[in-house]
């Protein structure tokens, strides 16, 4: 276990803020995009290349920086995980994009990891919706460049997504009532 990994897992257990390495400063995001064959000019590519990034291996969360970020450790030269973690969130939580269909999420769906429960919870939004949220309060467009490197707190995201989902639920109810 590297010192960074130990610090990261200790912080996870203590429910405190996570340490992350700046993907833009060390080129880690570009390495991750290349390892997962994500086009750098796609919406996901823009976010990965300009956001903080963490990987998951063997059921444990690991923190890497620079060229180590998605270092390969298998004979068949595959990345550590089918999950790609995004975001440095100050009150101790991470978001991830599922890269395959799993029991808890479909491919491309965003999940939320709560350090309190250490469980992944599907958020009911896909990658595009997550990126729209990440960029909508800023001047950049979806095809623009991530300038600030900031990401809002999970509370702010949860509030935003809850409001959006409530609105969609109300619209669905109105449509159902109108059809009846």
Predicted region positions:
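A short, terminal or domain-edge coil/loop segment
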Residues: 71-79, 108-109, 142-149
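Intrinsic-disorder-associated interaction segments
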Residues: 1-5, 120-124, 150, 154-161
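Short alpha-helical interface elements
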Residues: 57-58, 64, 68-73, 111, ...
């Amino acid at each position: 276990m590297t010192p960074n990994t130990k610090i990261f897992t200790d912080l996870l257990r203590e429910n405190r803020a996570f340490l992350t390495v700046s993907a833009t400063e060390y080129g880690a995001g570009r390495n991750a995009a290349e390892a997962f064959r994500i086009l750098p000019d796609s919406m996901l590519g823009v976010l990965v290349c300009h956001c903080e990034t963490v990987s998951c291996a063997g059921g444990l969360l690991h923190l890497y920086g620079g060229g180590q970020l998605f270092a390969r450790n298998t004979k068949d030269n595959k990345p550590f995980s089918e999950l790609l973690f995004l975001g440095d969130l100050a009150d101790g939580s991470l978001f991830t994009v599922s890269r395959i269909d799993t029991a808890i999420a479909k491919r491309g769906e965003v999940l939320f990891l709560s350090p309190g429960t250490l469980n992944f919870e599907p958020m009911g939004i896909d990658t595009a919706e997550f990126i729209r949220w990440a960029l909508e309060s800023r001047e950049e467009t979806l095809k623009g460049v991530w300038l600030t490197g900031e990401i809002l707190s999970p509370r702010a995201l949860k509030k935003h997504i809850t409001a959006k989902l409530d609105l969609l639920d109300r619209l669905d109810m109105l449509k159902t009532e109108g059809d009846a």
